[in-house]
Amino acid sequence: MVRGTKRRRSSAEKPIVVVPVTRDDTMPVDEDLVVGESQCAASKPFAKLVGVRRGISSIDLADDHFVCGRGSDDAPTNFNFSQVAKDVGLYRFISKIQFSIDRDTETRRIYLHDHSRNGTLVNQEMIGKGLSRELMNGDLISIGIPALIIFVYESADADHHPEELTKKYHVTSHSLGKGGFGKVLLGYKKSDRSVVAIKQLNTQFSTRCSRAIAKTRDIRNEVEVMKKLSHPNIVAIYDWITVAKYSYMVIEYVGGGEFFSKVVDSKYNRMGLGESLGKYFAFQLIDAILYLHSVGICHRDIKPENILCSDKAERCILKLTDFGMAKNSVNRMKTRCGTPSYNAPEIVANEGVEYTPKVDIWSLGCVLFITFSGYPPFSEEYTDMTMDEQVLTGRLIFHAQWRRITVETQNMIKWMLTVEPSNRPSAVELMSTQWMKCADCRTAKQDILKSIKPISAAAPAALQTTQAGPVKKAKM
């Protein structure tokens, strides 16, 4: 039995197949311990280590003990990482014996045992030298630091995801987020190992607006909206696959987390991001909304949680996401939906009167208010008025932190939060102001242009729908 494990989870019986291991000129390996393809041909693989970093091969696992590390005469390994010896950023973290993968002969469970002082991580959690962790299908294996992901562990008999998805993508168990419909998982495209986000939606859950069953056609609406969009500040969609009660949307991976986390980061002392950084982000969001409205799309749920950061840097590219409530603005919009503290007065009134894309401008004003100040413009914490009353009257309270924000910026926020829609600016009007022509906005524009590059994962994808009948495909 394997001792010192950090977790135990139920797992079906699975098998170590190894690819031929070449000798590293500077790190000799004991060839007696290196199993070639012919030696393990009789053993059926119980699992695979899928290489997701450039230069690292995938490894079939069929034996009960498999060792990974740099290797040496006194520390033989089955896989010695010689393929990435020139990848200094990774190779410097690899120990002679980094980790081993062991199959318990009694329980048939699979464990990763960490042998390295630099550390081995599973799902971005450090195991610790001398400790073990049970491996489950889709687990991520990293070396040294969370960002250095090298393998995805795939069980041979795993059936968690449909073949229509797994034949094109490696789906990990690493969660990027959860919502009312399902979850978002980290994935990799098999053709080029490019990283993607896979949004798994349970079509038996209710929709956020109508509380009705979320039919495939409801999700198709979101997909159809996203298909029309191509902008560096908007998350791209690559693929859509629907099988039985689940739909899978394969979208652009954005690794910096939610913008909300940045806004409330303790390093800003709940005082907001300030004038310079706030305007840097304001330009990006206004540009994204300007584009959406120019192609006839109203988002209807703009909030910090639906804005993603490209990375953890202080100045990063923002990406607008979650188009579940988006609608073609040519069609009539009357539904009360969205998030209460970011909803425009005309939505809150809910009098059955049509509203316009200017509801997005109001929501943007709310986002920028909290961006500059660190607190929301409308809140249930104000006990003198209900949330709806605050919104319907446009009551704003400017606390002390606004003293470091220019009057010009304060006036722009007030303009966006004008109760009467006809007096509220459009995205075109906002972008045309002198406020958007400052040095920080010019820097933002330059950074956006630098970020534009071909996305390999966006190579021709197909919409796939598998229900009662055969798979139907349509070019995106």
Swiss-Prot record:
Leading EC class: transferase
Protein name: Serine/threonine-protein kinase chk-2
Binding site for ATP: 177-184, 199, 252-258, 305-306, 322
EC number: 2.7.11.1
Record lineage: Eukaryota, Metazoa, Ecdysozoa, Nematoda, Chromadorea
Domain FHA as annotated: residue spans: 66-127
Location of this chain's protein in the cell: Nucleus
The entry's keywords: ATP-binding, Cell cycle, Cell division, DNA damage, DNA repair, Kinase, Magnesium, Metal-binding, Mitosis, Nucleotide-binding, Nucleus, Phosphoprotein, Serine/threonine-protein kinase, Transferase
Expression sites by tissue: Highly expressed in germline tissue.
Cofactor(s) listed: Mg(2+)
GO biological process: cell division; DNA repair; mitotic DNA damage checkpoint signaling
Transmembrane feature ranges: none
Source species: Caenorhabditis elegans
